[in-house]
Amino acid sequence: GNAYMRIYSTKTTRITANATVNAADTHVRRSANYKPSSWSFDHIQSLSSKYTGDDYVARANTLKDAVKTMIRKSGNSLRTLELVDELQRLGISYLFEEEISNLLETIYYNYYKFPENWNKINLNLKALGFRLLRQHGYHVPQEIFLNFKDKNQNLNSYLLNDVVEMLNLYEASYHSFEDESILDDARDITTKYLKESLEKIDGSIFSSVTHALEQPLHWRVPRVEAKWFIELYEKKNGMSPTLVELAKLDFDMVQAIHLEDLKHASRWWRDTSWDTKLTFARDLIVENFLWTIGFSYLPNFSRGRRTITKVAVMITTLDDVYDVFGTLGELEQFTDVINRWDIKAIEQLPDYMKICFLGLYKSINDITHETLANKGFLILPYLKKAWADLCKAYLVEAQWYHRGHIPTLNEYLDNACVSISGPVALMHVHFLTSVSSIEEIHQCIQRTENIVHYVSLIFRLADDLGTSLGEMERGDTLKSIQLHMHETGATEPEARSYIKLLINKTWKKLNKERATVNSESSQEFIDYATNLVRMAQFMYGEGDEDFGLDVIKSHVLSLLFTPIQGI
């Protein structure tokens, strides 16, 4: 089923295939034994931040002006790339989008567009520029790195003393497309070099290398990275006190907006009454909200965070209906009602399914109404289809389970890319961008079909990889790891390696697609979609037993409840 909240609890196995519900409902339904929420409604509503006053806004504006002056003074030199990188990693580049856009355009035409200019750039800035320019949609070919190896295919000896250079080349290599062998070699060589260098380095460079080897920057969640990088950058030689102060202040001011979004979502959750009327429903409003910060932490995405939290909660609840509580007969009826989207059809459903359908029906209609009021177009047909597709995919998994069918890995993944819930979540995201015409959004939906598929595939594989073997043994459906073992006779470590390889290959396809679908109206959506992948890889780890509730709780406290500058 769905991945959003799998890691917070372990489900019991599904009810048996021959379980039926008669008029007296003699079948005893299993509870999934979920833990109660760590945060009560009253606690969430009591949260507040002092970083909302006019004084903070005024100070932030003064600091922004100072940074704009820094950017102007840096000119169009290649060194300016380091400033752009710092602004991005500190989480404040969104405040200087126009300045950064102009800078990168000038630097691209001066140094990167024409091969005859490449020899003016040292490897460090080649790698940094390559990463930033590809990230921003510029075409920079892999051949820019042709001479980083000697004729024996080893690293050129003059590179062997510069860890920062190797680190930048390592990070650049994760922006590769399929069949870019120069970048593949760069990744292999730099990974080996950086691992070996750990014994010889210390301080902030040691922290940076360890961090990068755990996960490359391109795969990291921007908000989580900002929290980490602010603390690292503050201790760095030559750091800018202006950047540090602005990054901290902005982090705390934006966190205050997130708190209001969370409180809004929490009130909505209470109003659904699902936590009291649906005994199996999980109260995971805070954890679900954390996902939305992964989509976008920016202040102007408030409506998006509030909407996506509702979507994630509804996905989690439907997942429990299909995975834990419903009999196969009930699930087939329920899927039919969702497909018809007809309130009159709910008479045939058991009471808990009526409550579930009515909650979904009302919430989707409310979202539709809000979009109609704000943007002037009707999105219900798009949303109805996305939710029906999700429920059909859930039903397929339930049918496989009840019939004892073991799908092939490809058969599983075709369905699991839908049941992971990426397509339904991203369909909602299409209508939360700043694009204001339904024609443009329709074009964007068509243009980004491959992106949605690749994002959903990595989302699914990351979820499966994050399922430890113990959890799989307790769980109710086969995952891609087990299916690969079943098909090929591979061991569990071999199967995990294969899934990681698939994730790597799919990232390359996603990178290519991001570069190809380079229209302004799609860019915002593409960034949100890529952030969903990053959030999935962040939330699921790689099957570590300890990656559970306590880890997530610490992230919630760090990102949502604790200001950097203190309370």
From Swiss-Prot:
UniProt binding sites for Mg(2+) 2: 319, 323
Binding site for Mg(2+) 1: 319, 323
Residues given in the record as Mg(2+) 3 binding sites: 463, 467, 471
Upregulating conditions: By wounding.
Catalytic activity from the UniProt record: (2E)-geranyl diphosphate + H2O = (R)-linalool + diphosphate
Necessary cofactors: Mg(2+)
Any one of the GO BP annotations: response to wounding
Transit peptide: 1-24
Keyword Iron: no
Keyword Magnesium found: yes
Pathway(s): Secondary metabolite biosynthesis; terpenoid biosynthesis
Signal peptide: none
Annotated motif DDXXD motif, positions: 319-323
Pfam families: Terpene_synth, Terpene_synth_C
Location in the cell: Plastid, Chloroplast
Keyword set, alphabetical order: Chloroplast, Lyase, Magnesium, Metal-binding, Plastid, Transit peptide
SUPFAM superfamilies: Terpenoid cyclases/Protein prenyltransferases (SSF48239), Terpenoid synthases (SSF48576)
Function of the protein: Monoterpene synthase that catalyzes the formation of (3R)-linalool from geranyl diphosphate, but not from isopentenyl diphosphate, dimethylallyl diphosphate, chrysanthemyl diphosphate, farnesyl diphosphate, (+)-copalyl diphosphate or geranylgeranyl diphosphate.
Domain topic, free-text comment: The Asp-Asp-Xaa-Xaa-Asp/Glu (DDXXD/E) motif is important for the catalytic activity, presumably through binding to Mg(2+).
Protein name, UniProt field: R-linalool synthase QH1, chloroplastic
Source organism: Artemisia annua (Sweet wormwood)
